[in-house]
Each structure stands twice: as C-alpha cells, then as structure tokens.
Amino acid sequence: MIEEKLKKQAAWAAIKYIKPGDIVGVGSGSTAEYFIDALGSIKNLIKGTVSSSRISSSKLKDLNIPLFDLNEVSLLNIYVDGADEINQKKHMIKGKGAALTREKIIASAAKKFICIVDSSKFVHVLGRAPLPIEVIPMARTLVSKKIIDIGGSPKYRKGIITENGNVLLDVHNLIILDSLFLEEKINNIPGVVSVGLFAHRAADIAIISGKNGIKIID
C-alpha cells in the first residue's frame, strides 16, 4: 500500500510540467496508470496524448482523453513514464510490461522525458532488475547465446508476445557499469529489436517519491 501511494505521488507531481495545449506522451505500467488518472483531471487543458501500449490507450479512452498516432504529431513536448530502475544519471531499465520498444520510440520523439518512480526503483548501479530485450522470434536462441557471451543469464518470457509480434528475453545477473556501451552492444546483435536500457535516451527529469517526500533530479 505504501509503494502504491508513493507511485501515485510521483505521478501527480509530473502534472505541473504539462502545459496548456500539449500533446503528452504516455508510458505503460502501474505508475504510468496513476499518471493517466492525474492527466484526466486536466484533460480539457491538453490537446491529447500519444500512448505506448494498448492498455494505456484503453485507459485514456475510458477517461475520454484524445489519442493521436505518433506519425500525426509534429511536436511532442513531453513524455511521462515509469521505470523498473533508474540511477543518478537518469539511465533506466524499462520493459517489465513488454512495451519497451514503443516506449523508447515515443521517448526519443519527445523534447522532454520525465521518469516517475517510487524510491525503491532508484539504484546506484543498474542490473538488480532483469533487463528485457525484444527479439524477433527466429533469433531468440542466437540472441540468448550472444547475451551469455557478455555475462548475462537470459530467460525466455514464455507466453508473452509484444504488440509488435515479437518475443522477450529477460536478462539476469548483469551488473551494468557502462549503460551507454551495453545498450549499443546489445542493440547491434542481429535479431534484437530493442533493449530495455534507456541510456542514450535518458530521462531529462526524474521524479522520485519517497517517505520523506518528492526528490527531483534534473
């Protein structure tokens, strides 16, 4: 219950960064869902949203918040999403909810990326959480072998197909000291669609909600 309260506080703290007339990029996951609830309170002030997943899109529609296809949007001022982990550099691990590729696309399109998390997600070294990788199905074994070669322990996320029609590997036992290098290295493996390491497109602002209040890293 305390964790959910902290997620909600972080989500509502992001509202002050929204400007009238904005089209807002919206992420996926439990913290992003709290942000969608908060966005509903100012839906008449914004132009609409771009969503990273079907689940988020459904919630936005339920609140009668307009949705746009990213290809229709010439300027996306802001993207708000949670993370599985985030460090002081605002590099993140994302993808527990299987929407990492679309999240990375929208984050890259946005002028400003705000990450909203509770304090349990703030770490000094990334890698405690599994690192998700979206993979073309025929390349799953090849990619797994390449990940083992760099010291990771990949596990196939059975029964999950991404909205892009691909599969997921969750990589355990990685201590990520150079996230920029590792993101590039994994992305260069044939068959990898996207890795849930957000270092080259780090957050611009991190909103971290803890027992002592809100901490902002910008």
From Swiss-Prot:
Substrate binds at residues 28-31, 81-84, 94-97, 121. Pathway: Carbohydrate degradation; pentose phosphate pathway; D-ribose 5-phosphate from D-ribulose 5-phosphate (non-oxidative stage): step 1/1. InterPro entries: NagB/RpiA_transferase-like, Ribose5P_isomerase_typA_subgr, Ribose5P_isomerase_type_A. The active site is at residue 103. It is an enzyme of class 5 (isomerase). It holds the Pfam family Rib_5-P_isom_A. It catalyses: aldehydo-D-ribose 5-phosphate = D-ribulose 5-phosphate. One of its GO terms (biological process) is pentose-phosphate shunt, non-oxidative branch. Keywords: Isomerase. GO terms for molecular function: ribose-5-phosphate isomerase activity. Transmembrane segments: none annotated. It comes from the Bacteria. Its EC number is 5.3.1.6. One of its GO terms (cellular component) is cytosol. Homodimer. Catalyzes the reversible conversion of ribose-5-phosphate to ribulose 5-phosphate. Belongs to the ribose 5-phosphate isomerase family. This is Ribose-5-phosphate isomerase A.
